[in-house]
């Protein structure tokens, strides 16, 4: 049952990510901004050929090599730790986010980013980035609370 739940979460995460990215591309000009919540959040359409804070900009080969490795390792750990809820949640979200951005990189050579925080200087990000970030936080909690790793 958990395998099916993991698959559903991954598919829903990818669909949400890809549908929203497509909406942004269709409705916002590249570089333009639409205010969503004044002084808090806006949508700014950018093409990101790197990672957060423009690290590895223009290094698509790095992501095209690294992402499948991360996915294989995450899938292996998901299989091994399926019964442990924190690992299950974290790894499932990481896989969904990694696949969402990987699909962009393979198809377009860049990732569509759109969420811009207005109240702090933070990189523009997307739904896949949110899934990855939350997944890594949950995985970190899983590792810290795992009695087997102590």
From Swiss-Prot:
GO terms for molecular function: aspartic-type endopeptidase activity. Belongs to the peptidase A8 family. It is a multi-pass membrane protein. GO terms for biological process: proteolysis. Its main location: membrane. This is Lipoprotein signal peptidase. It catalyses: Release of signal peptides from bacterial membrane prolipoproteins. Hydrolyzes -Xaa-Yaa-Zaa-|-(S,diacylglyceryl)Cys-, in which Xaa is hydrophobic (preferably Leu), and Yaa (Ala or Ser) and Zaa (Gly or Ala) have small, neutral side chains. It comes from Lactococcus lactis subsp. cremoris (strain SK11). NCBIfam families: lspA (TIGR00077). GO terms for cellular component: plasma membrane. It is an enzyme of class 3 (hydrolase). The keyword Membrane applies. The active site is at 113, 129. This protein specifically catalyzes the removal of signal peptides from prolipoproteins. The chain crosses the membrane at residues 5-25, 59-79, 82-102, 124-144. Keywords: Aspartyl protease, Cell membrane, Hydrolase, Membrane, Protease, Transmembrane, Transmembrane helix. Signal peptide: none annotated. It is found in: Cell membrane. Its EC number is 3.4.23.36. Pfam families: Peptidase_A8. Pathway: Protein modification; lipoprotein biosynthesis (signal peptide cleavage).
